Amino acid sequence: MQQPAIMKKTSRGADWSTPESELFAERTVAINGPINADTAVAAVAQLRYLDRNSGDPVTLLVNSPGGSVSDGMAIIDFMRGMRSPIRTHALGIAASMAAVILACGEPGFRSAAPHADILVPQPMSGISGQASDIEIAARSIIRKKEMLAGLLAEVTGRSLEVIEAATDRDTWLTPDEAKSFGIIDRVCADWNYEGSVR
């Protein structure tokens, strides 16, 4: 779908921009779609640019069915090294790695829209091949599951046992349940917290 153009009158005439560039000008970055290498590179590049130019808060909008653990961790590792606080907000869906990214936002500023779907992840892989390949892949999945459980325990304040039980199978949460679980801090339609908040 083609982005609509937005016209702004200036002293020089008219300037044209897209909704995406308007969000970026407001220090807002969107992860929209599966988390993969392209998503990670785009998100990190935008976050880096905003962090270099100011230490003011950045909002990260998340609408993603999840995806690669490695690419999601690249985004999280970069977020954690920024001087700008990262406010996260789920719109639509934040599943699997997207839910982990959502949870890794600035404490007190992690939110979800009232009808967002949030999935606490269980790492998966389509394992095939010889027995030794399957064994190596299984060990890798177990390591990733332990790493994600430790990270979620850290950012939610839940015990490792509670996180491991929740990630033993995919766990779908409403925004209110995600708030109780510690993945988010607020349920609100507006990521600037200007509307109704609970």
Task: For every predicted segment, state its role.
Residues 1-97, 103-198:
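N-terminal organellar transit peptides
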